[in-house]
Amino acid sequence: MFNTNDFIFTSETTPDVTTDLTACVQQVEDLISVADAVNVTDSPNCKSRLNSLLVASEIKRSGLDVILQLTGRDRNQIALESVLLGALSVGINKVLCLSGDQPDENGPAVVNEFNGNGLIELCKVIAGGTLSDGTAIKNPLPIYPGAADDLYTQISKPDALDKLVTKIEQGASFVQTQYCFDYDVIKQYSEKLNTQGSFENCKVIIGMGPLKSAKQGDWMRKNLWGVNISDAILKRLEDSGSPAETGEAICQELIEKIMDLPCIDGVHLMGPSC
């Protein structure tokens, strides 16, 4: 995925609350010959699900490359290092490093020993052949950490780019962004990234997905961090006799428009479940 100049397509899956591992793998079977990789999420919304590394391992065995999402919310250093060693042992070497969704006030306890930046640094330590305490790793393997980003924050806050560049300098090999449905915003983001040489060796993948209705889009822009959907898009969906088909068309049109933008290397297609 990182050794190509081709436009990258990634997608994602969220393990279910189940003991049926086969069913989790079957959810992504249609992506095997289409996507470059699939993200496996790590207990999003702070809700317990089937272990993400177990699901990711089975998906990897099916022939589809995997990006393991890993949060610092639930695990201390020992647990995180164990997960990273486990991932490498089954051939998973791409890890999207996240702080993780935080629980409600009366929700489960969290650890938060590592945020996204700290996880990127931890990955680079592991890739260097040791644990954090200096213990040598037998049969060390390369690992490619990734960072998350929000386009709207980038184009509205002058210091946001410095924070992203810091993640690249720490060792992030790729960036996956939150949903964006606005070409002008992606273009501004592209132009801002292009002012920095830091992204020459980092793949930037824009998050998007087909909206099914205006109601869904309105909910997303009101409730999801970093998501801004224009009134024009919502009106187009609302006026459509087939809003799901219109949502797919909007997504496809946007992909075609951004493919030649500098510093934009692919799209991360997500299926909104709201």
Q: Where on the chain are the PLM-derived regions?
A:
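Active-site mouth loops of central-metabolism enzymes
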Residues: 7-22, 66-78, 143-159, 237-249
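Hydrophobic faces of well-ordered beta-strands that scaffold small-molecule active sites
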Residues: 9-15, 36-40, 66-70, 95-97, ...
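Short, acidic/polar
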Residues: 17-31, 51-52, 77-84, 156-166, ...
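Active-site-adjacent beta->alpha loops and helix N-cap segments on the catalytic face
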Residues: 20-22, 46-58, 76-82, 102-135, ...
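Structural motif
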Residues: 33, 90, 170, 261-262
